[in-house]
């Protein structure tokens, strides 16, 4: 056997190694227990992958993002094997890793019960303990069809691969290039225990799955279409250690306490009446108060930053979205057309941008007007499948704080930098502080425009992002059909990441709508367009803030900022006068004049997460004072009314948390 040279890459450090021909990645990293797979030539591979001369090999450790995804994918196989051991008639769907976990879909005779899930977890634990070996086999299409003849969904995926090539569902299982099956083999006898169509890679053995849990089950349509059979989906999670699993479960429990859907009901903020339909929220008075404050503050900041407010209708003729390309690229996300005016198709608008373009085009424009920044709280409608809608974070009727900026080419770098700074500053005003940026590039096969235009737009966004002193993460292929985008990712109080603002450079729509302005030299030039949604949507940002603060919004955002609590009914008029003073200064205040005892009134206000409580009894009335009680239970007695009012106003004006 001859020797070959390979390079081991660890971050910025590279080490050249001489190894025997046929050496595997496992042998290269022998003794490094945390290494569960490798990246060879930029592609993820099993540790059993043989190395060739010139290969650049990077270890993938179990505690890295890629490592966790591989562990979770392998655990999905183990859970699927457990299901088929317990329910032999179960047919397999797909089982990909997802954020913080994995799922696997099954066609079974009945939904899984909690007892079933316990049994599945127990059997999966036995499989992991057995140390079954993951072994990759390359097969032909005919061989795959023969081996998986009893798995109709796998057969369908094989067909999708051969006919479509890049089908998303097929890609989860079969990927690109050759077809592969992974066998789970008995570590002693080598006997086949189970197999699945899969592109891999996987951990070497089931013992390389350090910690996992089966979480829940739910119904899911095959390939996400309501026209297809309904399957049963088992969700699970897997981590690099038991401690990491416990920490995740703690975060999950904390997230459940903060669930905006539960808080929305408890705090009487919003609801989703079945009479209206899934994904369509109704905001109650208290929720409406929060939205009003959010929008009013945003409106004020936008005016200060040179934005001009516009309003556009909720429906439009199809012509508009034919020109924009939405009907070609976004039709699945739109509601069906309404036929009006003698057969013309009208659509509920899914996006505001084409209408803002029409405002720009409504008259001749000069370079002196640029940059032109148009802004709207525009409600749009998107047909999200009923199984996908989720509280306020995924809805069908949504209000975007939507801006479209039109500028000259030479203004783009400055405008992008200004927009990003404005976005981050405004998000910080709402109490979010921990950010990173994500740059999404051209989506393969789903984009309009030339390579040069995309490269130029992407580079402009990259330059703007680099000036913000924040981490920049690449999202290859994640851009919109008309241009690349930067998204602001924010981490909340319990460390979860939320995508918030998006900023997109668009070369395409100005061309499609033949937009022009008169340049300084008298020629007609094409403006450049920036799409920008700061909150993303009002509804989603509302939910994020509610969960970030666990319902205890800072005083300036709280729907009720102050509650007056009289010790007896005799003190109601006094507190009513105090409330009037606060109300005159714009404070949202209530007086609890119910028949409840004082202690219950305090508990009620605390449950409603009211920032300030003003208590009054005989002594307070005599002194013109109140007892000033805070949300955390601390209390100052004998505070003069004017001092209490001033302190409340100060907290609201400075937007501080209490």
Curated annotation (Swiss-Prot):
Pfam families: HGTP_anticodon, tRNA-synt_2b, tRNA_SAD. Its main location: cytoplasm. Keywords: Aminoacyl-tRNA synthetase, ATP-binding, Cytoplasm, Ligase, Metal-binding, Nucleotide-binding, Protein biosynthesis, RNA-binding, tRNA-binding, Zinc. Residues 259-554 are annotated as: Catalytic. HAMAP family: Thr_tRNA_synth. Its EC number is 6.1.1.3. The keyword Zinc applies. This is Threonine--tRNA ligase. Belongs to the class-II aminoacyl-tRNA synthetase family. Homodimer. InterPro entries: aa-tRNA-synt_IIb (IPR002314), aa-tRNA-synth_II (IPR006195), aa-tRNA-synth_II/BPL/LPL (IPR045864), Anticodon-bd (IPR004154), Anticodon-bd_dom_sf (IPR036621), TGS (IPR004095), Thr-tRNA-ligase_IIa (IPR002320), Thr/Ala-tRNA-synth_IIc_edit (IPR018163). Coiled coil: none annotated. Binds 1 zinc ion per subunit. PANTHER family: THREONINE--TRNA LIGASE, CHLOROPLASTIC_MITOCHONDRIAL 2, THREONINE-TRNA LIGASE. Its cofactor is Zn(2+). One of its GO terms (biological process) is threonyl-tRNA aminoacylation. Residues 1-61 form the TGS domain. It catalyses: tRNA(Thr) + L-threonine + ATP = L-threonyl-tRNA(Thr) + AMP + diphosphate + H(+). It comes from Parafrankia sp. (strain EAN1pec). One of its GO terms (molecular function) is ATP binding. Zn(2+) binds at residues 353, 404, 531.
């Amino acid at each position: 056997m001859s020797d070959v040279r390979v390079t081991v890459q660890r971050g910025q450090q590279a080490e050249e190694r001489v190894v025997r021909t046929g050496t595997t990645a496992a042998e290269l990293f022998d003794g490094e227990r945390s290494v569960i797979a490798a990246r060879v030539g930029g592609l993820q591979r099993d540790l059993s992958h043989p190395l060739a001369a010139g290969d650049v090999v990077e270890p993938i450790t179990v505690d890295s993002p890629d490592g966790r995804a591989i562990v979770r994918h392998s655990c999905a196989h183990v859970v699927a094997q457990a299901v088929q051991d317990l329910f032999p008639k179960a047919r397999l769907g797909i089982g990909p890793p997802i954020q913080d976990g994995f799922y696997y879909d099954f066609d079974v005779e009945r939904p899984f019960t909690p007892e079933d899930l316990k049994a599945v977890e127990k059997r999966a634990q036995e499989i992991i303990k057995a140390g079954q070996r993951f072994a990759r086999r390359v097969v032909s299409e005919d061989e795959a069809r023969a081996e998986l003849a009893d798995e109709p969904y796998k057969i369908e995926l094989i067909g999708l691969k051969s006919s479509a090539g890049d089908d998303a569902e097929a890609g989860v299982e079969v990927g690109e290039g050759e077809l592969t099956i992974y066998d789970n083999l008995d570590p002693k006898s080598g006997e086949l225990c189970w197999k699945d169509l899969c592109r891999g890679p996987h951990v070497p053995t089931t013992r390389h799955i350090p910690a996992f849990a089966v979480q829940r089950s739910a119904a899911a349509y095959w390939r996400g279409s309501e026209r297809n059979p309904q399957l049963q989906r088992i969700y699970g999670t897997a981590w690099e250690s038991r401690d990491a699993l416990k920490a995740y479960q703690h975060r999950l429990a904390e997230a459940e306490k903060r669930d905006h859907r539960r808080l929305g009901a408890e705090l009487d903020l919003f609801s989703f009446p079945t009479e209206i339909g899934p994904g369509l929220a109704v905001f109650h008075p208290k929720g409406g108060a929060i939205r009003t404050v959010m929008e009013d503050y945003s409106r004020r900041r936008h005016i200060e930053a040179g934005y001009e407010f516009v309003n556009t209708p909720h429906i439009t003729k199809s012509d508009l979205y034919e020109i924009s390309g939405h009907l070609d690229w976004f039709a699945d996300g739109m509601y069906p057309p309404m036929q009006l005016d003698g057969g013309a198709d009208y659509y509920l608008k899914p996006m505001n941008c084409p209408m803002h373009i029409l405002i720009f085009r409504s008259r001749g424009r000069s370079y002196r007007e640029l940059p032109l920044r148009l802004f709207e709280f525009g409600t749009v409608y998107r047909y999200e499948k009923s199984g996908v809608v989720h509280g306020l974070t995924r809805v069908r009727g949504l209000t975007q704080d939507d801006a479209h900026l039109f500028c000259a080419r030479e203004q783009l770098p400055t405008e992008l930098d200004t927009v990003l700074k404005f976005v981050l500053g405004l998000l910080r005003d709402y109490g979010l502080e921990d950010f990173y940026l994500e740059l999404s590039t051209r989506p393969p096969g789903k984009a309009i425009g030339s390579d040069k235009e995309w490269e130029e737009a992407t580079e402009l966004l990259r330059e703007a992002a680099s000036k913000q002193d924040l981490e920049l993460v690449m999202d290859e292929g994640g851009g919109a059909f008309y241009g690349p985008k930067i998204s602001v990712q924010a981490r909340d109080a319990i460390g979860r990441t939320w995508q918030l603002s998006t900023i997109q450079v668009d070369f395409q729509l100005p061309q499609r709508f033949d937009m022009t302005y008169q340049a300084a030299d008298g020629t007609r030039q094409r403006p450049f367009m920036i799409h920008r949604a700061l909150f993303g949507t009002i509804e989603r940002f509302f939910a994020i803030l509610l969960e970030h603060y666990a319902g205890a919004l800072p005083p300036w955002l709280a729907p009720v900022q102050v509650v007056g609590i009289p010790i007896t009914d005799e003190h109601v008029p006094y507190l009513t006068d105090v409330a009037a003073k606060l109300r005159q200064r714009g404070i949202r205040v209530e007086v609890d004049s119910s028949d409840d005892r004082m202690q219950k009134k305090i508990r009620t206000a605390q449950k409603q997460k009211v920032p300030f409580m003003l208590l009054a009894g005989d002594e307070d009335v005599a002194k013109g004072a109140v007892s000033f009680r805070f949300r955390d239970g601390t209390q100052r007695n004998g505070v003069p009314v004017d001092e209490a009012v001033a302190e409340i106003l100060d907290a609201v004006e400075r937007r501080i948390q209490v």
